[in-house]
Amino acid sequence: MTKRALISVSDKTGVVEFARSLTARGWEVLSTGGTFQALQEAGVSVTQVSDVTGFPEMLDGRVKTLHPAVHGGILARREPQHLSQLEAQGFGTIDLVCVNLYPFRETVARGAPDPEVIENIDIGGPAMIRSAAKNHSGVLVLVDPADYPVALQDEVSGSERRRLAAKAYRHTSEYDAAITAYLEGASEELPTRLPERLTVDLHRVAQVRYGENPHQPGAVYRWGQARGPVMDAQVVAGKPMSFNNYADADAAWSLCQELAAQEDGAVCVAVKHANPCGVAVADDVRAAWERARDADTLSVFGGVVAVSRPVDFQAAQAMRGTFLEVLIAPEVTPDAVEWFAEKKPDLRVLVAAQASGVSVLDVRPLTGGFAVQERDTRPWDDLCPEVVTARQPTDQEWADLRFAWATVKHARSNAVVLARGGVTVGLGAGAVSRIWAAERAVANAGDKAQGAVLASEAFFPFDDVVRLAAQSGVTAILQPGGAKRDPEVIAAANELGVSMVFTGSRHFRH
């Protein structure tokens, strides 16, 4: 009995050669639409599916293969009872289904209007793929051109058929997830930002050497059609990105962009292990880098740096003496790229991509599941800062408090930041007590604490941080407030002549 293959693909990579190889082995090839035309024009012997079903394609191609002659031929078990039923209807078996789906993701990604996107939701394709995958013991299902050679083997093992079936179901499930994400995103009235069921469409975009540590495999995945500034950045110089490089660069860029939105100058952010270690604003990138570097010359070694403005030759040269893992910027001039490639060949130099379609959700892994929340993107302008002390902050202190507040939001809790004149002078992050974070920040600042401001991402349970800050020369403090001992904390600030501002907004980061 002649074997039959149904081929209907949007991605026509290698399909002509594949179909020609099948016919050379005695297969009959069935096809539809554009695939039929492509095979026919290439001189491949091919039969139109409508000749098998006895019905023409309908509704502008929306109905082509949704017919018992197709699905019966795919789903029939290769046993007498099913085969006799096919024969009674005049249907034959279909032994191979080669289908990949309408380019839905690509249509969304290029910003097509909604009617065009909807038209690129494939119906017949997923139905055939799922039918073939269900009956994989008798039908080969191919959704990836890389698997075409498998079908040309004399025998295909049961385990290989099962692998192809699993791949097929993954293909359709990812496709459905992309459609779900689009329709939910396009809806003006979502029932909730955190639905009862959350479908996540992830596909791998980068394979890294390993994860956080050499014994952990690692990779980078895209969520739906989102484009990320780091994930999709152009690497213009240096080595391939590592897992930790991606994480740190994303943390640095996130803080850099938040500060750039509220500051007038060029912003530079240095990050180590996802925590800021030097942050500064200045008139130009070179000056901002030098201020951020000098904020903590020890910690910036081996760090990741993000800047808010283009990096030119002068800024590049200023980085000569510091070992860095990654530099990310909105633009890097050609002479700077050339200099980095020659003088710092191991430094990964990235031009950030324009972010789009980014989820508002922040997803954290748990054993057996995930904890999901909305990202903390609250801007300063959403706050209602309240001065709770007799002494009011000066204009410069207000500017520094705002700068320190944005920075401390991006540090791991417990966190305290000291800043003065648009640069961090002391940071304490990841501490298990508030006072320890403050002690670390003060020690980091040294004499630079004199005249600085202090910001904390959460309230003070006691007045110890206020007393330490005042003793170190800090003149203004910003914190959320809301502790039981707020009156004692305020009294200590008044006693010591320190300004204190409550924001009413906590910013834990774990």
From Swiss-Prot:
GO terms for molecular function: IMP cyclohydrolase activity; phosphoribosylaminoimidazolecarboxamide formyltransferase activity. The keyword Transferase applies. GO terms for cellular component: cytosol. CDD domains: IMPCH (cd01421). Gene3D superfamilies: 3.40.140.20, Methylglyoxal synthase-like domain. It catalyses: (6R)-10-formyltetrahydrofolate + 5-amino-1-(5-phospho-beta-D-ribosyl)imidazole-4-carboxamide = 5-formamido-1-(5-phospho-D-ribosyl)imidazole-4-carboxamide + (6S)-5,6,7,8-tetrahydrofolate; IMP + H2O = 5-formamido-1-(5-phospho-D-ribosyl)imidazole-4-carboxamide. It comes from the Bacteria. It holds the Pfam family MGS. HAMAP family: PurH. This is Bifunctional purine biosynthesis protein PurH. It comes from Deinococcus deserti (strain DSM 17065 / CIP 109153 / LMG 22923 / VCD115). The lineage of its organism: Bacteria, Thermotogati, Deinococcota, Deinococci, Deinococcales. The gene is purH.
